[in-house]
Curated annotation (Swiss-Prot):
GO cellular component: extracellular region
Propeptide stretches in the record: 34-39
Localization of this protein: Secreted
Keyword rRNA-binding among UniProt keywords: no
Protein name listed in UniProt: U3-scytotoxin-Sth1h
Length: 71
């Protein structure tokens, strides 16, 4: 192998490794951010009374009656 082909091989490996690292970090950030975003939305929804609901668990410790949350 010539010096140019070795350098080219190393650069190709570095680019693939960097891309893999970026994708891995993005996946980890997404998996952490999604539950936090859901908790934030749920906490905001819990502060509002009279929201539509289907079950008691939809009402954040309230009671679902006639498709609306009662507190």
């Amino acid at each position: 192998m010539s010096q140019n082909s070795i350098t080219s091989y190393k650069m190709g490996f570095a680019k693939h490794f960097f891309l893999f690292a970026v994708l891995l970090c993005a996946t980890a950030m997404y998996s952490v951010a999604e539950p936090a975003q859901e908790r934030l939305i749920e906490s905001i929804a819990c502060m509002q009374k009279g929201l539509p609901c289907m079950e008691h668990v939809d009402c954040c410790h309230g009671v679902c009656d006639s498709l609306f949350c009662l507190y």
